[in-house]
Amino acid sequence: PARQLDLPPCKSRRADAFITVKGEQTDMKDVKVLIGNYGSGKSELALNFAMQAAARGDRTELIDLDMVNTYFRLTERGKLVAQKEIRLISPNFACSGIETLSLPAEVASAFALDWDSVIFDVGGDDVGATALGRYHRDFAALPEGALEVLNVVNIRRPLASTLEKVLHLQEGMQTHARLRITGMINNTN
């Protein structure tokens, strides 16, 4: 039998609807992908973006695809996320002490279900970005303007301390994720 999804209630709908080619009106999904080097602050930013979206009344899904950094997981913030009515999807076995993680099937719900805002927290290098590449066709099917892929940069991190290093990391992440980075966030502290 099909597994029942526990979806947060929809408090309000966003006003930025668009018309499809067939003339049907549908809500525009806001999808943010935060990608960047290990220790750049992606997970905290992803959490903050999700909390802002939920505060607006958006049905919000937060997806932890960070398969690289097992030291900080969004799963550890599960209680806070649940209080804000944000649906959190984390790698299988996250926070269990098992080092080999796998992606849950629920990640596909970001594309199949009617979420207003979906935020992806993606691994800290080109290897971590490979997990995202599995969904490149789903991202390509999103309406124009619905997707932002943001490279989070902290120049205090050794692998991102120069422009050349940042651009080298970005090139590898774009290649492995099969997505073009559309903007950068300077998260240097």
Which functions belong to the PLM regions below?
Residues 34:
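Hydrophobic anchor at the beta1->P-loop junction of P-loop NTPases
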Residues 39:
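Walker A (P-loop) phosphate-binding loop of P-loop NTPases
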Residues 42:
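Conserved lysine of the Walker
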Residues 52-106:
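N-terminal phosphate/diphosphate-binding loop that engages ATP/GTP or pyrophosphate donors
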